[in-house]
Amino acid sequence: MRAVLLVSGGMDSLVATALAHREGLELAAMHVNYGQRTWQKELECFRQICVHYGIVDRLEVDAMFLSAIGGSSLTDATIPVGPADLAGTDIPTSYVPFRNANFLSMAVSWSEVIGANRIYIGAVEEDSSGYPDCRKVFYDAFNQVIEHGTRPETRIEIVTPLIAMSKAEIVRRGMELDAPFHFSWSCYKSEGKACGVCDSCARRLRAFASVGMDDPVEYEVRPNYLQ
């Protein structure tokens, strides 16, 4: 069976890739550049992950229209990336409006062309309070969209293997699978050293600390987010 992996270069997509690789599937990987602040580092990580898992069939997509639309601190330099607020329930400035729907649409198109039956995405329900397109109900609904919007003989399913996991569980699972976390990047702000203070860095650092492991990525600062 053939599967398309949506690989941002982040921790979650890395572990989703490791899980798909363990299944023995024929893998193809897609990476999307949408004008995010750390696009160069994310692309570098995507390529390193593909080499690590022997993924030859790759597609690097330019989706700069999401940057032109704006509305997110990830794509608009005039909107600052705020400090971590792990207890917050509001939609953060880093939310890219309807981003994952755009990514999935491109992945479905490619899957139809290359005959893939599954699309893996490292979405996590734990993030859904801030990112509505990380909810399980969203992916269930999108599977219906695929069924009704593709050729009758097309059979493509979105697979979200991490959807019910916590970030700590994702790190633990990645360790069990010997996933190369040093080839992943989570920081929203920086491409040299991870900032350590944005929401994504905070969630990652807290997850590694929760399982008693050191994150191999280099940080400007490493606050203790377990306190």
Curated annotation (Swiss-Prot):
The lineage of its organism: Bacteria, Pseudomonadati, Chlorobiota, Chlorobiia, Chlorobiales. Disulfide bonds: none annotated. It comes from Chlorobaculum tepidum (strain ATCC 49652 / DSM 12025 / NBRC 103806 / TLS). Belongs to the QueC family. Keywords: ATP-binding, Ligase, Metal-binding, Nucleotide-binding, Queuosine biosynthesis, Zinc. Its EC number is 6.3.4.20. NCBIfam families: 7-cyano-7-deazaguanine synthase QueC (TIGR00364). SUPFAM superfamilies: Adenine nucleotide alpha hydrolases-like. Pathway: Purine metabolism; 7-cyano-7-deazaguanine biosynthesis. InterPro entries: QueC, Rossmann-like_a/b/a_fold. GO terms for molecular function: ATP binding; ligase activity, forming carbon-nitrogen bonds; zinc ion binding. Binds 1 zinc ion per subunit. Zn(2+) binds at C187, C195, C198, C201. It catalyses: 7-carboxy-7-deazaguanine + NH4(+) + ATP = 7-cyano-7-deazaguanine + ADP + phosphate + H2O + H(+). It comes from the Bacteria. It is an enzyme of class 6 (ligase). PANTHER family: 7-CYANO-7-DEAZAGUANINE SYNTHASE. One of its GO terms (biological process) is queuosine biosynthetic process. Its cofactor is Zn(2+). This is 7-cyano-7-deazaguanine synthase. It holds the Pfam family QueC. ATP binds at V7, S8, G9, G10, M11, D12, S13, L14, V15, A16, T17. Catalyzes the ATP-dependent conversion of 7-carboxy-7-deazaguanine (CDG) to 7-cyano-7-deazaguanine (preQ(0)).
